[in-house]
Design a protein with these regions (language model features):
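Canonical helix-turn-helix DNA-binding module
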Residues: 49-73, 79
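N-terminal helix-turn-helix DNA-binding core of bacterial DNA-binding proteins
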Residues: 13-52
Length: 157
């Protein structure tokens, strides 16, 4: 896989550089919504319980597209409708988001039970965690080809 984005970063640290790209309040939630909740459209993202405002959602979708984490696709039979899918770089973030889910489930008070994501038994079981990550990734990829049969890639500006 090639490097996704070249620019000047505040340091040479990969953690800092990654946060420069996806460390805002909304980007990982959009990625989560795509692979975990199978949201694809602007309207679906805007209906998330976190209540992202439409101007910020537009900005984050465009940013994630520009850094090649997601791609914007146009429906062939409806030129006004767009769906968003993860790129290879975006798919590589699935384990990271799942690790954050597990961390939040175990470390944030009053957070458990908000979403039944099947993660409560994964914290100390590396095999179960890897199996879960593989299952979520495969589930996302399995649903993807069905959707892409009616999509056309829109070139990024």
């Amino acid at each position: 896989m090639s490097k996704i984005f070249q620019k000047k970063y505040r340091s040479g640290c990969p953690v800092a550089s990654s946060l420069d790209l996806i460390g805002d309040k909304w980007s990982l939630l959009i990625i989560r919504d795509i692979f975990y909740f199978h949201k694809r459209t602007f309207k679906e993202f805007s209906s998330s319980p976190e209540k992202i405002s439409t101007n910020i959602l537009s900005n984050r979708l465009k940013r994630l597209e520009n850094i090649k984490i997601i791609q914007k696709n146009q429906l062939k039979d409806n030129k006004k409708s767009f769906v968003y899918t993860l790129t290879e770089s975006g798919i590589c973030l699935i384990p990271t988001v799942i690790e954050i889910l597990i961390w939040g489930d175990h470390n944030i008070q009053d957070n458990s039970g908000l979403l039944d994501m099947g993660i409560s038994n994964l914290k100390d079981n590396q095999i179960a965690k890897q199996n879960y990550i593989t299952k979520v990734r495969q589930n996302y990829l399995k649903k993807l080809p069905q959707e892409l049969t009616s999509l056309t890639k829109i070139a990024s500006n």
